[in-house]
Design a protein with these regions (language model features):
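Bacterial N-terminal signal peptides
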Residues: 11-19
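Bacterial N-terminal signal peptides that target proteins for export
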Residues: 2-11
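Short, structured beta-strand segments at or near domain termini in extracellular proteins/domains
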Residues: 162-180
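C-terminal membrane-anchoring or membrane-association module
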Residues: 198-213
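Sec/Tat signal peptide C-region and signal peptidase I cleavage site
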Residues: 20-26
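An exposed tryptophan-centered "aromatic clamp" motif
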Residues: 62, 66-73, 81-150
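A short, hydrophobic C-terminal helix/tail in secreted or cell-surface proteins
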Residues: 182-201
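Extracellular adhesion/carbohydrate-recognition regions
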Residues: 27-77, 167-173
Length: 213
């Protein structure tokens, strides 16, 4: 029996599945329309890290993020800090922007994003207008409610600043992805299983015929 058609179908299904899974395993995915999905944190970043074009105090920055409508989504916010990590501390990777800084951009303590401006860092180059400066987080600093958390992309430090006097940048995010998770992955794996089972059965029948000769 000619197995070539089945083998071609099987090879094609494997190739398609591998391509999809490589995309699914990517940490940062450009979803288009100015949005970058972070599959590890399950949040979507604005591609433009300075969409407002100006520094703002904390309350204005909150209001700016809340008023955004990008890609038909209007549930934007400022990034979350990591209060447990502490004040004036490096390597706070539970901080959403800290995770991006250390884990996705691969930067280290005291190393700023300016070191990536002219480089070939693929993750960093997904974004535009990233400032080597201070970005507000979306939460107050509980021990001193006149202050709010921020993250400094010039040094990688998490700290807090006065909500009214501090003029920093805002970088908006939203929870979750901006596209529906496709069912193709499950269907492809199921299809591969069926193709593999069919191939095994055909090979078994061929061996049985040969053994009967």
């Amino acid at each position: 029996m000619n197995m070539r058609p089945l083998n071609k179908i099987l090879a094609g299904a494997i190739l398609i599945t591998c391509c999809w899974m490589n995309l699914a395993n990517a940490t940062l995915i450009n979803r288009g329309n100015g949005m970058i999905y972070d599959s590890v944190q399950n949040i979507t970043w604005l591609q433009n890290a300075n969409l407002s074009g100006t520094k703002m105090n904390w309350e204005d920055s909150l209001a700016w993020a809340d008023s955004l409508s990008v890609g038909s989504f209007d549930d934007w916010r400022l990034s979350n800090p990591d209060p447990i990590c502490g004040l004036a501390v490096y390597n706070c990777t539970v901080n959403e922007l800290g995770h991006l800084f250390y884990n996705e951009f691969g930067l280290t303590q005291g190393q700023g994003v300016s070191s990536l401006f002219s480089g070939t860092n693929a993750n960093f180059n997904l974004f535009i207008n990233v400032q080597a400066s201070v970005y507000w987080s979306g939460a107050e600093y509980a021990p001193l409610t006149a202050s709010a958390w921020y993250f400094n992309t010039k040094t990688g430090i998490q700290s807090a600043g006065n909500k009214q006097k501090g003029l920093y940048y805002g970088w908006a995010v939203r929870d979750g992805d901006v596209v529906a998770v496709p069912a193709f992955r499950s269907l492809a794996i199921f299809g591969l299983g069926l193709l593999g089972l069919a191939a095994c059965k055909r090979q078994g029948r061929q061996r049985a015929k040969l053994g009967a000769v």
